[in-house]
């Protein structure tokens, strides 16, 4: 089989502040569009109003409500309140700089600190594009918070491998593949079976014994992917972002009633209304307070996941992209603005003979890295 050709980044969804989303004009892009500098980009981090791109040469470029550029960058993490930048130092240390988003890369940063990596060689040896490791710091003993204090230490025994932040909660994946969550829980996004908040990282007991490979935090929902390719999802389902039946889409005529089993027993909040073909009430799930197993169409195995504010994107082992949830700005990539409460494959990449390798969601948009499929 021939080697894969160099890939490129694509974007779709909300771009009302002029952030780079390919060739689209106006406030939104409904279908994947190549980014102008997509070949050189290796990391993408998107907030609501701007996006940070890091190139393979270490150049950081901002697009949208925040603008500017800087060199010697290893990683960047964008949020509405601040921009965190990891810059290469003269030795093994890296320099972490935190800027207010409105004055990013201009003047002095709000805060800066030297960071010593825990181990060398943590980046992908093949140089494959990734969404980046921030907000977890290279030392794996602390992370960056969008609210002061910006530097948040982690207990050493957590042995963090990945950390993701939602609007009010945090998810941590440790070296053993176990998941911890903490923060606000009013939408069930912590996965502990209640709507209570947690001040400290708490092991997700429902997944204990299962080895997870990746976690993703949406605005108020959570996803994790196991090493065997299974997807577990929980939290708020207001726009169908959990791929479970939701009242909002049913009222818009954009969903169909489906049979659900043991919905009450698994702890989810179920609301029922009339309308099923057999006359029985149709089940709708508003909040799923602990992990539910989600099957993709055709039994596809997942390898990567990312969440927007109210939408979800998953990459399969065969390089296909599935999206669902809120689609008002085209962030699902299906050439329309329909919201979905079930996974749907993004046909653009199939039609173009592209294999998706990475996905990273902003609150209202989506960025995808894909390569041309190798030819036998």
Swiss-Prot record:
Keyword annotations of the record: Chromatin regulator, Chromosome, Hydroxylation, Repeat
Modification type (3R)-3-hydroxyarginine: residues: 141
Annotated SUPFAM superfamilies: RCC1/BLIP-II
Subunit note: Found in a complex with KDM8. Interacts (via N-terminus) with KDM8 (via N-terminus).
Phenotype upon changing residue 141 to A: Abolishes hydroxylation by KDM8
Function text: Plays a role in transcriptional repression of satellite repeats, possibly by regulating H3K36 methylation levels in centromeric regions together with KDM8. Possibly together with KDM8, is involved in proper mitotic spindle organization and chromosome segregation. Plays a role in regulating alpha-tubulin deacetylation and cytoskeletal microtubule stability, thereby promoting cell migration and TGF-beta-induced epithelial to mesenchymal transition (EMT), potentially through the inhibition of KDM8.
RCC1 repeat start and end residues: 6-56, 176-227, 229-317, 318-371
Pfam families the UniProt entry points to: RCC1
Interaction with KDM8: region residues: 1-169
PROSITE patterns: RCC1_2 (PS00626), RCC1_3 (PS50012)
GO biological process: chromatin organization
Protein's UniProt name: RCC1 domain-containing protein 1
Coarse class of the protein's main subcellular location: nucleus
Gene Ontology cellular-component terms listed: chromosome; cytosol; plasma membrane
Subcellular location: Chromosome
Keyword Repeat: yes
